[in-house]
Amino acid sequence: MSVISKVSYSLYSQNEINATDININYVKDDDEVGTVKDSRLGATDGVLCRTCNRTELECFGHWGKVRIYENIIIKPEYISEVIRILGHICLTCGLLRSREPYTVNISSLTSGELKKLKDKISSKKKSCWNSRCMQPYQKVNFSKKKVCLVNKTDEFCVPNALVYEKITSIHHKFWPVLDIHQDPATLFYRGYFSIPPLLIRPVISFWIDNVPKDTNELTYLLGVIVKHCNANADEPTIQKAIIEYDNIKLISTNSTTNNLSYITSGKTNMLRSFVVARRKDQTARSVLGPDSSLDITEVGIPDYVRNTLTEKIFINAFTIDKVKDMFQRGEIKYYFNKQLHQLTKIKQNKFIKNKIHLLPGDWVETNIQEFTNIIFGRQPSLHRYNVISSSVRKTEEDTIKIPPGIANSQNADFDGDEEWTIVEQNPKSVIEQSILMYPTTLLKHDVHGMPVYGSIQDEILAAYNLFREYDLTQDEVLNILGKYGLEFLTDYERKDKYTGKDIFKFLINEPEINYPGIICNGEIIAENIDSNFIVSMKHMSISGLITDYKSSVEGIKFINKASYVFKRYLKIYGFSITFRNLCPDFEFTKKLREQNIKKINDIKHSYVKYLYDVANGDIIPLSRSDEMDAVDSILSGLTNFNIQEIEKYMKEVISKDPDNSLMKMSCAGYKVNPTELMYILGTYGQQRIDGEPIDTKIYGRVLPYFLPDSKDPEGKGYILNSLIQGLTGSQYYYAMLIARSQSTDIVCETSRTGTLARKIIKKMEDMVVDSYGQIVYGNTLVKYAANYTKIQGSVCKSVELIYPDESLTWFLEISALWDKLKNGFIYNQGQKIAKYILAPFNFKVFMKLDETNPMKSKDLYDKIQLVIKDVRENYFFDVTSIDFIEYVFLTHLNPSRVKVSEDTANLIFEKLYEKLNYTLGGGTPIGIISAQVLSEKFTQQALSSFHTTEKSGGIKRKLGFNEFNQLTNLSKNKTEIITLISDDITKLQTIKMNFEFVYLGELFPEITIEEDKNYYRIDINVNRLYIKRNQLTELIVEYMLEKFVSYSVLVKNWGMETNIINEHIIRFSLFIVFTEPVNLNKNKFMMMLPGAANKGKISKYKIPISEYQSYTDYNKTVKLYRLTVELMGLKELGTFDLVNVNVIPGVWNTYEIFGIESAKSYLCEALLSTYGEGLDYLYQPCDLLASLICLNYEPESINKFKFGPVSALKRATFGDNKAIINAALYKKTEPVNDNSSCHFFSKVPKIGTGYYKYFIDLEKFLRIKKTISEKLIDKKLVDIGDNITDF
């Protein structure tokens, strides 16, 4: 079959509908011939198609027709299109509503002139210009009640026949003026209505509430249409039946009946369910377990799965002998004869006549063999490391077994997790997966380049203990190494005694590999081996360094060997941990508990004294937030005290008992840290929901264990007891209260994050790398350089950012580059400075730490400049800046830091060219990769129990998913967080004073009311210290009262005076005459006064001004003040003096003021900041997403495809059921390029290996001659060599 390059959409013409000879003219029939279940309409389960005699896998169905006699029916989805066309013509005479189209040559008009002509036809003229007609124009609507077109003025029915006659009489030369793209007759059914094939309405397997239905709902609706047509019903009746079948929402608002529109829209649409994500055969699912005997590239499949699933073997010259043997051994289950087009089930002792021919193209099915490639994964599949393809191995029992090394990448534990598997049947896909999805190929992460496989659990402890072994005899070493012992004897140097370091050197087996502080000439020079060296996703992972030096094959080999050796070491030497290891000395926990009780009592005593002094009026109280922060920090001090005591205790235990198992675990970086020990031995600490202490409930308390309005910290969720002590009833309740909120979070967040992940992947999936190393989206250039280095992301490496220093050689050149680059490294409003920089690859593994013959600094500098100049011109075409690559080489290869020989320099630059030439292939699906990495991270973050929060100004926000969601949805007309930064605090104080919400009650006023003859006198005494603390003035308080009283509808007349009583008290006196009824209004007024007399924007957050040191350079900071306020727009700041104030608005304000490029930069930094600390490597995916959102003239939400040519099939799979309807109406032709379209037309998308064509002519292999090389003459060899050099 030839490859489909483009697809056109159009409507079926009536002639095409009439062409079928399958007449449907019965409602019921014994053998269902002539009914809507007629087997001529296509094959169904186990029944061949009576039209083409094929099975349901090969028959795509056939259309039928039912006669509608003289009726004319409008196709339901195009009723609005018919009404639109009628709006441009006269319904009486059929002429257009303007004379001009008849007087000009339409085909010669430009697009601008054609647009003007269209406007004239749409003009609001009242009556027809045709002198023979002169009738008023009629407005036509569709009546849901009458189910027909009606005249808007008198609600009289407009016959479909009249509409059909007028619309089809429009001459085709006028179609461009009316935006008609094909014969308008295709908008109607005339003579016959089409009956769709059985394929879209299967009679079996249609389930509702677990009750099997014999008849699909669509089939039932079609039966109703046939029934009305047979009865020759009137037009509206047939029209209504067809609308109910097509889209019932056209006439009914609250119906959820299945119809064509319903099954092609929304989350469960047919395209998404049966084409994009259909269920597959040859799959299995089972519980997951570990098997340490498996290599990383293997998976254990139980016997019952291997005996159930089958794989195909195609007959050709290479396989025919094997297949014959398998027939004789009775291992063949099915045989497919291509000539006869027949699938035969092979049963034991059953004679088969004239069906087994074993010709090329035939295939057989047999049980899965060992070493067949099988795809398996664990759900949810958040990124591509969850789904891999490994070699099948036999395994005991009934569970799927995986090597423990891949558990991290699949986020799997062995507590009942399940894994799914699938055996692909197409040899092409088996070959493809065995390369592209093989664990060796997937070892390094696509973005940060760290290995995704590594040791887990007890292997970490084994590595730590093994490294510390010494005085090992050769026999002991051989025993530990097991099956690798023979290799050790032949390859490793002989010694009398060996250490753990020797075993690691043998496992690494790369004598040339180096890395500062870790490896020197293949030997580990670090003090200890902890989790950082052997666990997956670590920068210092030894397997990662080996991969950077050699390839993934050697990296996987190390993981396999190390895992085997660690397990064997544990088996021989053992490792155990008991309760004694956890708490070797109960005196310590007793003493710590006594100290905790003493300290919590001191805290409570101080707090009570403070509350007592406030009640007596000796001091003024702190504001509620300041009081909570103060208590919080004191309790945090108690927690920190526990951690410090435990750390001190751990050091004492290590000095007394260095073999304590728990301490070993802690040193190895496995499971135990001082905070976790604090929960067990010290105190369980403050319980929080979303970073906040627990809110009080009824009577100002959480539990009835405490007095109403109690301020006791233990009543607010501080758990003093440790787990070893056990929790009291109330403490246990607090622990479970947090567990409840976390459980709810996880349940709710899973679906939200999954939905957003799907949208982001759908949005980014068609962004690929082109053959120039640029990122393109369709035909639009998005980025000049993929990954900024034009090198695959898994190869790039974050290295330490070395700041300019006078001790560095080439200091002036480095400083000049730094001045160009520094603004990119100082971010987050100057609060942070980058510690790492992207290197094009991990060149440090090639640098020898004991170099004796270094290059001269000038020669090295010239070589670096030569390479950079060549790369800039020939790889980046002088379009993209690569100053950062030059900076990395000048600082990291600096003679003042390292000695680099000429051979090492040449090797490093050869490797650089190798990476530039070969790693980033054209078609790399960088959009999908970036989308998956972002989605995986925010899903993990949202599901994590521990959300980080930060106070950004007064707005306390949960970092992570919520904000990421808002940024990508880009909702307009919502408040935006605006940050103001200045070195002058007074300018910010003015803004704070105006915008911060303060109400009278916050000033703790004493309010009294007295009745006079004609009015009420209300005295409000306020302590001026409260006014000062809230950074207000007496005038502002006066203004608050004045504003409230003047706008109050309860007040008839009023007056006001202000008096200073003494040094501290100021009195505001209100003289008020209330409206009738006086008593009721007086009571309402007094109830409202403390809260309703306020100023600023109503908000539960204060607007604090924070002070921080802002970086201006790596060694310079300035003191700045920052304020964050939530506003609708910047207009609200228009009246303030903002000279020399740095205003950082939200995304829409940024776009409206500075344009799309600034919005892109803002979005990139904002998206990255939602992930928190330590995830800077996500900058590239965030930048790519921001670039896509800002690809056009305004930012576009990821929910929409407003800009750019998005194919109808992509829109359809995204849930837009109108996409294909509109494409057919406008007769669109679209290229089959994007992922969604390629799904439907069996076309390999041009991503990844899409540029390679699979074609093997086996005949050539059979005829190949060994002597072919001898026929090449010497001259030809020289020519070939020259050509390769030129290339």
Swiss-Prot record:
GO cellular component: DNA-directed RNA polymerase complex; virion component
InterPro entries from the UniProt entry: DNA-dir_RpoC_beta_prime, RNA_pol_asu, RNA_pol_N, RNA_pol_Rpb1_3, RNA_pol_Rpb1_3_sf, RNA_pol_Rpb1_4, RNA_pol_Rpb1_5, RNA_pol_Rpb1_clamp_domain
Catalytic activity: RNA(n) + a ribonucleoside 5'-triphosphate = RNA(n+1) + diphosphate
Membership in a protein family: Belongs to the poxviridae DNA-directed RNA polymerase 147 kDa subunit family.
Domain of life: Viruses
Keyword tags: DNA-directed RNA polymerase, Nucleotidyltransferase, Transcription, Transferase, Virion
PANTHER family registered for this protein in UniProt: DNA-DIRECTED RNA POLYMERASE, DNA-DIRECTED RNA POLYMERASE II SUBUNIT RPB1
Principal location: virion
SUBUNIT field: The DNA-dependent RNA polymerase used for intermediate and late genes expression consists of eight subunits Rpo30/OPG66, Rpo7/OPG90, Rpo22/OPG103, Rpo147/OPG105, Rpo18/OPG119, Rpo19/OPG131, Rpo132/OPG151 and Rpo35/OPG156. The same holoenzyme, with the addition of the transcription-specificity factor OPG109, is used for early gene expression.
GO molecular function: DNA binding; DNA-directed RNA polymerase activity
Pfam families: RNA_pol_Rpb1_2, RNA_pol_Rpb1_3, RNA_pol_Rpb1_4, RNA_pol_Rpb1_5
UniProt protein name: DNA-directed RNA polymerase 147 kDa polypeptide
The species this protein was found in: Fowlpox virus (strain NVSL)
Enzyme kind, highest EC tier: transferase
Described purpose of this protein according to its UniProt entry: Part of the DNA-dependent RNA polymerase which catalyzes the transcription of viral DNA into RNA using the four ribonucleoside triphosphates as substrates. Responsible for the transcription of early, intermediate and late genes. DNA-dependent RNA polymerase associates with the early transcription factor (ETF), itself composed of OPG118 and OPG133, thereby allowing the early genes transcription. Late transcription, and probably also intermediate transcription, require newly synthesized RNA polymerase.
Subcellular location, record wording: Virion
Entry EC number(s): 2.7.7.6
GO biological process entries: DNA-templated transcription
